């Protein structure tokens, strides 16, 4: 499992999400929790969401090349993420890996889990507290919106959101299911009693719906 943290692409760190590793390991997975540069970066080295997506592609290419040395199986990798990380997980599912590295199978990533993910970034350009950091252009918003892409040819995305999340997060959860369809998104659920933050900890608890869905997706 490669897990990508959230934080609206502008905050938090992999260290804040290391708690997801032990329960996933207990399910039988080799776990990689990745970092990325945060928006807006610096004047000398600005960071955009497409830049972050490219960093995640490079991180996944590293995983393909190296995970076997750490006890993982490069042919059975699930990418998961929360919030902004869920958005990036959906993007990676749709990636044509042959364009990245001819040695990587075109549809290498077959399984993705998006927890409270975002799939259409165009409305964020009208959200001042985010736009100040993200500096999304219309072009970048379209480029980085999985809901505006054709559905992936192969692979499945499980998408979930907490029942107590904002209407916009619930809309995004339904949106990707509507756009990509039930064949690609066979699981689209709202988990009752969970908000945008408690849903992540639910992943780590045995016996929860999210834990069960994760285990089923991993198929370990």
Give residue ranges: language-model regions.
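Alpha/beta-hydrolase superfamily serine-hydrolase fold, recognizing
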Residues: 1-220
């Amino acid at each position: 499992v490669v897990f990508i943290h959230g934080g609206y692409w502008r905050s938090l760190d992999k260290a804040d999400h290391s708690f997801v590793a032990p329960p996933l390991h207990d399910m039988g997975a080799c776990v990689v929790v990745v970092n990325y540069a945060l928006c807006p970066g610096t004047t000398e080295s600005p960071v955009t969401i497409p830049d972050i997506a490219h960093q995640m592609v490079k991180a996944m290419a590293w995983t393909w090349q190296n995970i076997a040395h750490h006890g993982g199986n490069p042919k059975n990798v699930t990418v998961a993420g929360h919030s902004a990380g869920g958005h990036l997980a959906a993007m990676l599912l749709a990636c044509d890996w042959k364009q990245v590295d001819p040695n990587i199978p075109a549809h290498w990533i077959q399984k993705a889990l998006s927890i409270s993910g975002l799939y259409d970034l165009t409305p964020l350009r009208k959200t001042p507290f985010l736009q100040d950091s993200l500096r999304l252009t219309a072009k970048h918003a379209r480029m980085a919106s999985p809901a505006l892409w054709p559905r992936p040819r192969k692979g499945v995305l499980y998408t979930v959101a907490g029942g107590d999340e904002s209407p916009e997060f619930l809309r995004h959860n339904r949106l990707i299911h509507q756009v990509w369809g039930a064949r690609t998104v066979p699981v689209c659920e709202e988990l009752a009693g969970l908000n945008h933050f408690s849903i992540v900890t639910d992943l780590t608890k045995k016996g929860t719906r999210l834990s069960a869905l994760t285990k089923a997706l991993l198929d370990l």
